[in-house]
Design a protein with these regions (language model features):
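Membrane helix-loop boundary segments at the extracytoplasmic
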Residues: 22-38, 93-94, 236-239, 358-402
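TM-adjacent membrane-interface loops and short helices in multi-pass inner/ER membrane proteins
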Residues: 292-329, 333-340
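Interfacial loop-to-transmembrane-helix boundary motif in multi-pass membrane proteins
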Residues: 10-18, 68-77, 108-160, 359-363
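Transmembrane alpha-helices of multi-pass inner-membrane enzymes
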Residues: 51-57, 209, 247, 251, ...
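N-terminal hydrophobic segments of proteins, predominantly signal-anchor/transmembrane helices
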Residues: 14-32, 50-95, 104-106, 128-130, ...
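Transmembrane alpha-helical segments and their membrane-water interfaces
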Residues: 53-60, 85-139, 342-351
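Alpha-helical transmembrane segments of multi-pass inner-membrane proteins
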Residues: 118-140, 164-236, 245-255
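Hydrophobic transmembrane alpha-helices and their immediate junctions
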Residues: 211, 215-226, 247, 251, ...
Length: 425
């Protein structure tokens, strides 16, 4: 009984840490709005606390060869970072943060022994409830959380850039023009616990991928509730990209489940090739703040980036092409790290179940598609969710490949502690 109690307490602690990782901004925004101004240093401290917690809790459960693999990856990043520093005499803390997140949440996820579907259904309920309150009384949400003040104080945003002077919501929450969904209404775009709508949209894509992987092992009531929450959040956030990416995941789900996970490194290059063909077919020739305009920016950036930018030696390029996540990825980390990431992800992060393979491939598809138009998937609020689930699925013992089917008797004991991770409800 004692070990089970210990594991249960650890799982609760892990769940709270994950919720804090994706929702800490709303806590700091509340403090900023109601108690005292929050500085950028406080947001950095919160993130450092999160990463320390991830490693502190999770590292003890990893097998030695997996610890060695993670250390090798960290060593490669440190080596490239040192090389870039010796050439440029410059370090960007944000680029380092981007590289730490996958390792931290892989480690945290590997220590989790609870049910992934139940965990994220609870999280989706929380996100939906806060979004519902925000849509019902947007002025109250704006006064209590005040995203405008929070982003001005912690991100250096220009208050003049918030075009709606009558609202304290995030700038894109009350963008000009009609809503895509519920056109004609005066509703804002919901931000929920994420404080800004883009990350709320990223959560929708993640939750959709999770449902596509685990729906077999969810009961009818939980599955129906999950679908209702997903549709509500799409309408609440008014997320075109979230809706489009979710449709892409639904259409690609059968293929993602069957695609050999070792071929996942091909997904990003194929998505980029598809983007180039889309730009050519549509004839887009300049940047606009639209989905297609941002796709054009990605294609344009990859065609025009200098050799220094590809090698990660021109730090400014990452911010020049801020709306192109792929250009940002290459310029901020270097093409060497990007290539190593794709290969390590495909061949090193081996999933022992079909569900794991399906989620792994779905992540790469969503990641590549999202990076065509945004670099928001590098934020801890979005990236933590994906890497946490990948870590949980990675740490499953080798057993039944089809995790929704019962394991043979000789594998039951080995799988017992981790069965919920495979999707059992």
């Amino acid at each position: 009984v004692q070990p089970q109690v210990g594991h249960g307490l650890r799982d609760v602690l892990i769940e709270l840490l994950l919720l804090f990782a994706v929702g800490y901004n709303i806590l700091l925004a509340f403090i900023n709005a109601q108690l005292f101004p929050v500085s950028p240093a406080m947001t950095y401290a919160a993130e450092l606390l999160i990463y320390a917690g991830c490693f502190g809790i999770g590292i003890w459960t990893l097998e030695r060869h997996k610890i060695a693999a993670l250390l090798a990856g960290i060593a490669l990043i440190v080596g490239v970072l040192l090389f870039r520093y010796l050439i440029e005499w410059r370090v960007d803390a944000k680029f380092i943060r981007d590289a730490i997140i996958p390792f931290a949440f892989l480690v945290l996820g590997s220590a989790y022994g609870g049910s992934l579907p139940r965990l994220f259904l609870r999280m989706a309920i929380i996100v939906s409830l806060v979004a519902a309150v925000e849509l019902t009384v947007p002025n109250v949400y704006g006064d209590v959380v005040n995203p405008k003040s929070y982003y001005v104080n912690t991100r250096g945003s220009d208050e003049g850039g918030f075009w709606n002077e009558d609202s304290n919501l995030f700038v894109s929450a009350t963008r000009p023009g009609e809503r895509n969904f519920l056109a004609g209404s005066s509703l804002p775009r919901a931000s929920s616990i994420f404080v800004e709508p883009v990350t709320a949209g990223n959560f929708i894509v993640f939750f959709c991928a999770l449902l596509l992987v685990f729906w077999r092992s969810m009961g009818p009531k939980r599955l129906a509730l999950s679908v209702v929450l997903l549709l509500f959040l799409i309408v609440a956030t008014d997320g075109r990209l979230a809706a489009g990416t979710s449709v892409l995941l639904v259409l690609g789900a059968p293929f993602m489940r069957k695609l050999d996970q070792r071929l996942s490194f091909l997904i990003m290059p194929l998505v980029i090739l598809g983007a180039a063909m889309l730009v050519w077919v549509t004839g887009v020739s300049e940047y606009e703040d639209t989905t297609l305009g941002r796709v054009w920016l990605t294609v344009h950036a990859l065609r025009n980036m200098s050799a220094e930018a590809w090698l990660g030696l021109d730090f400014d390029v990452a911010y020049t092409y801020f709306d192109s996540g792929i250009a940002y990825f290459i310029a901020s980390q270097s093409i060497m790290i990007v290539g190593a990431f794709l290969l390590a992800f495909a061949f090193g992060l081996e999933m022992p179940t079909e569900d794991g393979q399906a989620f792994k491939n779905a992540f790469m598809l969503a990641f590549a598609a999202g990076l065509l138009v945004s670099n928001s998937l590098f934020s801890v609020k979005s990236a933590a969710l994906w890497w946490f689930v990948l870590g949980a699925m990675w740490q499953l013992p080798i057993g039944t490949w089809f995790s929704h089917l019962p394991a043979p008797e000789n594998e039951q004991k080995q799988l017992a502690d981790h069965a919920p991770l495979a999707g059992a409800s």
